[in-house]
């Protein structure tokens, strides 16, 4: 590699999913094309120890490498890689160091860049003369003619004027010729594993009616490979204080320090919760980006959470006529959100009871009714309390000033919740049927934020943040909820009953030994939490704003977003004086709801993209138990949130960068590049579980690949020459040859066994099952004989018989025949 020093601004044009056209980079393309022919120095796969360290990156503990270094095997692998690179020149392969690493660690996967083949080998839709295959000597001349025509050089048309720079190809440019052929022309991957650089070139045509310069322009893009260091630097650039945050000892400081309480009335007992958190039981992330440790629900932590979440209720409301105001708010709710003011709901008032009865019948058929309490025998005014162990990501630079307080959950038992859930589920179904189409509540059948035919261009947004939402709800909120439920056809006795045991309640934490009385607050874990919070938010916004002109409104719990052609106006003083709520209208407001940004696609639909500042912190969670299944569960959840990440085009990415800049980075103009880097990291780590596990300090291959269980009694010692013997069992000492690797690459192994071997394999499984059954019978017979000897010794007075032995004798005598004791 030449000694040319890359310009920082030149290299940092990172992470885009399409090409950015920039004429100023043409000189760099010529320099890059000269560098392609030069070998990469420092990471040559030559079988040496230095190449092993750079390619495998082993752990060195006490002078011993993990995984161990086998010079003979490493040399054979390097030779195999070189032969494969020389043989397969017609398809793009992964870097040689990565190939050697996969072979040495027995990591399953393809050596061919299949994604790049799909992207850069367009399907021939012509008359079929692009590639010809000679079946006999008569077609030899046609093959030579086609080969000569394909090798002809095409004169490139250069730009003579200055073309204005565009940020997206979707609006103006259309690709007409995209090439991705060999490693010696368009595509170059250096063997520097930490920071390889890709070079891609594509010709595009300007589809805009430009009278001055309609010529074809060329331009490259330089993409920086995603790495943990780059991802961590991205987070530190956006949130600088997160780089110095480490709360490993915060729990110990809290428990061993003094604590002062400021409660009017609270009940305490001696708690026996152990606050120590064993770090060896959890995966440790490799990135330090502000993630908090798992919170333990000790008495001090619970008191701190109760102080912020339940105590110190604000009292900002004025004196009002409670019943008349509640009826007026409920009437405004019906006229704003429901068709024909909700008359359809009242006509079918018995649907709630009918659906609830059907649910209970279905539930009783497959559930054990033992342990289910009768609701009349349960104190419904008493709620259990617990502390959430997971702390939400912090998106502000305040980690050096205050410690985030964990959220709390107040809930009924499972039996009580199972009694009330069917009623509220049926009631919400009725609300969904009567709800106007421009109002969206993402729950049930509409469980996501992907909306069709909703435009964001030339629209105003209203994004409001309601602070202290749960504990600020008072008697007025309870009354107009009751009126709305009655209007939706909810049974009146249940409505009044539900309202009565929410007036005065008692919270009790059985582990932290803390008890506290509350009034009118939202219970964060009962059957009506999400539905009730959504109704409260909808009713307050409808009463304080005119929603008749809005194009779309989304409500989910305490989150809301209004999209309108006319700038919406919200009376914030009414929230303070009437609803006892602290509200903050974001200025400028962006399409952001439920910690997700809404971005418009080319077809006029909306897709949701998770907040990059929150998701990048979730890549370094500190509460995942050291278990492969737990880590895989977090990976599945991460993939579910990133299901639309690969559908983003350049226009959508640019729009998302502007949204993030308006919401978080008004003083950080460089946040555009960091958002692109974060999106590239999300796309990489959501591809497979192997890449996701690289974010945590794991034990290498043992985390994402488990060896197959080996039977103690093998049928035969002969090894099968199949795909699974070499690539699925990473402990196999025998390594495949070159031809086997070639077959692996081109996919000649359609299955582990051929058709002829299937009967043999079936017979082998039967033999193994018989051997296991025979071994089990032999062990049981031996145990029976041993117990018989103990019984005989006890009868003759030569030994004692314990109670455990007596039980074993009884169980074996019931299992085996008397002839088995002979």
Swiss-Prot record:
The enzyme's E.C. designation: 2.7.7.48
InterPro entries reported in the protein's UniProt record: BBMV_Gp1_N, Bromoviridae_RdRp, DNA/RNA_pol_sf, DNase_TatD-rel_CS, RNA-dep_RNA_pol_alsuvir, RNA-dir_pol_PSvirus
Domain of life: Viruses
UniProt domain RdRp catalytic: residue ranges: 459-572
Glycoprotein in keyword set: no
GO CC terms, sorted: host cell cytoplasm
Catalysed reactions, as listed in the record: RNA(n) + a ribonucleoside 5'-triphosphate = RNA(n+1) + diphosphate
Cited PROSITE patterns: RDRP_SSRNA_POS (PS50507)
GO MF, any single term: RNA binding
Record key words, sorted: Nucleotide-binding, Nucleotidyltransferase, RNA-directed RNA polymerase, Transferase, Viral RNA replication
Gene Ontology biological process terms from the UniProt entry: DNA-templated transcription; positive stranded viral RNA replication
Subunit structure of this chain's protein: Interacts with replication protein 1a.
Function: RNA-dependent RNA polymerase which replicates the viral genome composed of 3 RNA segments, RNA1, RNA2 and RNA3.
Family: Belongs to the ssRNA positive-strand viruses RNA-directed RNA polymerase family.
Protein name (Swiss-Prot/TrEMBL): RNA-directed RNA polymerase 2a
Organism: Brome mosaic virus (BMV)
